[in-house]
Amino acid sequence: MRVLPATLLVGAASAAVPPLQQVLGRPEEGMSFSKPLHAFQEQLKTLSEDARKLWDEVANYFPDSMDHSPIFSLPKKHTRRPDSHWDHIVRGSDVQKIWVNNADGEKEREIDGKLEAYDLRIKKADPSALGIDPNVKQYTGYLDDNGNDKHLFYWFFESRNDPKNDPVVLWLNGGPGCSSLTGLFMELGPSSIDENIKPVYNDFSWNSNASVIFLDQPVNVGYSYSGSAVSDTVAAGKDVYALLSLFFKQFPEYAEQDFHIAGESYAGHYIPVFASEILAHKNRNINLKSVLIGNGLTDGLTQYGYYRPMGCGEGGYKAVLDEATCESMDNALPRCRSMIESCYNSESAWVCVPASIYCNNALIGPYQRTGQNVYDVRSKCEDESNLCYKGMGYVSEYLNKAEVREAVGAEVGGYDSCNFDINRNFLFHGDWMKPYHRLVPGLLEQIPVLIYAGDADYICNWLGNKAWTEALEWPGQKEYASAELEDLKIEQNEHTGKKIGQVKSHGNFTFMRLYGGGHMVPMDQPEASLEFFNRWLGGEWF
C-alpha cells in the first residue's frame, strides 16, 4: 500500500516520502473540510451537525497544500502508436459477435461480459533488445477501453519451463496507484535492476514454472494512461476481466492452462473483486483456479487492531515504539474500530473517508514518525524519495530510458512507480476501508484462497492477516480458526528441511507466515517465495 505525498496519511505508502515522516500540522484557524474539497460543498450542507463536526475534525489532518491539490488524476502525456506497430489487435466488438450453441441447443455468446468497447493491442517483444530473459517468449501491449479513453499496459513472460502445460498467473501490485512493473523488477520477475541501471537475471523468478502477466492498473499507473480516472476497486475489475478475456481469445493455448491471480498490499482489495468478477461470468475463457494475496489489506476492522502489537514487540521482532506511544495507540483503537464499523455498515464515502484518515493517523502515523521502514520493522527507511528502497529508484530510472520504452511499445512520455493522485482518488471515494473481505466466502465456495505474509512487515503485518482469516465467517471457520500453525519447510532443493515459515489450512483457505520477509516477500526471501509459490500452484494445500 502507498500513500499521498505532502497531503495526508492514507496508510501503507506513507512511510517513505519525506513530507509524510512529519506530524501533519493543523490548518489555519476556521478551515473546514469543505475548503479543500470545493466540489463537495453542496453535499456537506446536507450533513447533520455531528457529521459536519467529524469532517471538520478530519480536516485537521490536512496541510494547507491540500487546498491546491487536484482531486482527480491529471492525464499523462502520451503518443499513441499506429495500429501498424502491433502484431495483433483483438477487438472486443468482434468477440461479442461470436455466438455458440449451448448444451440445450440454445444460442449464447461464447464469452460473457460487455467487451464491445475494448480492444487489446499485442506486440511480440524482442527479448534480446533488453536482455531480459532472452530465451523466453514475451508480449507487451495495451488494453484499450475506447468508450472511456483508458489504456492499460501489460507485459507477459512465458514460463521458462514448460509453457504448454504450466499455469498462467496475473500479478498485481497495490498502492492503490503503484505499477506492477515494480513487482516485476524488484520482486518476482525474470530480472532485477542493479545500481548501474542494468538488468540482472533472477534465478528465483516466478516464471520459472508459470507464465506471468504483469499489469499496470488502474489507469495512469506506470505505463498506463487515460484522460479519465478510476477511483474504486470495482471499476478496475471490469478492465481486468476484459484484458484477460481478449488475451486468452488471442492465445487459446494459454487459456487451456490453469489460471491464478496473485498480488500484494492493496491487491488485498483488488483480488477479491477481480476474482468475483471473473467467476460471475458463466461463459468465460478464463480458467481461474486460485488466488494468492501477500501482505494484503483486506479487512481493516480486524487488521487495524494489530498495528500496536506489531509495533510494540509482539510480532516476533523487537519493539519499535515506546510504552507511551503503545498506550496512546491502545486508547485510539476503540474510536478507530467504531468508525470502521460505521463504514462497513454504510459503505459511504462520507463515513469511510474519515475512518481511513483518523485510523491511519492514529495507528500508522506514530510508527512513521520513528523513521523506521513501515515495510520492514528491522530497518530504517533508506531512501525516502523511493518508498524506502533505493531499488525502486533504479527501476524508475530504467523504465524511463527511451530505448526501454521503445522496446516495450510504451506510449507515455515518462514512467512513475506510484501515482499519488490515484491513491487520493481511491481514498476520497471511500474505497480504502470498504469491507472487500466479505467477498472471500463466495470465492472459497469455488476456488482456493492463499493469504501469505512476510513476518517483518508493519503496514500489512502477519498478525493482522492471520487474525482476519480466522475471524472470517464462512462454513469452515471453526475448523480453520482452530487449526494450528505448522512448520513450512523447503522440499524442492539442496536446502531441503530448512524452515521458511508456518502454514495452516482447512478446506479452500490457507494462511502462511514467511520468516524474514517484509512487505515484499519475493524480494526479501526469493528462495522461500518460489518454494511456496510452486507448491501452491501444484495444489499441495487444496
From Swiss-Prot:
Keywords: Carboxypeptidase, Disulfide bond, Glycoprotein, Hydrolase, Protease, Signal, Vacuole, Zymogen
Gene3D superfamilies linked: 1.10.287.410, alpha/beta hydrolase (3.40.50.1820)
Subcellular location: Vacuole
InterPro entries: AB_hydrolase_fold, Peptidase_S10, Propeptide_carboxypepY, Ser_caboxypep_ser_AS
Known glycosylation sites: 209, 508
Coiled-coil blocks: none
This protein's GO CC annotations: fungal-type vacuole lumen
Disulfide bridges in this chain: 178-418, 312-326, 336-359, 343-352, 381-388
Tagged with keyword Repeat: no
Active site residues according to the UniProt entry: 265, 457, 519
Primary location class: other
GO terms assigned for molecular function: serine-type carboxypeptidase activity
GO biological process: proteolysis
Record-listed E.C. numbers: 3.4.16.5
Presence of the UniProt keyword Metal-binding in the record: no
Cleavable signal peptide: 1-17
Catalytic activity: Release of a C-terminal amino acid with broad specificity
Residue stretch(es) of the prosequence: 18-123
Protein family: Belongs to the peptidase S10 family.
Protein name: Carboxypeptidase Y homolog A
Organism classification: Eukaryota, Fungi, Dikarya, Ascomycota, Pezizomycotina
Chain's gene name: cpyA
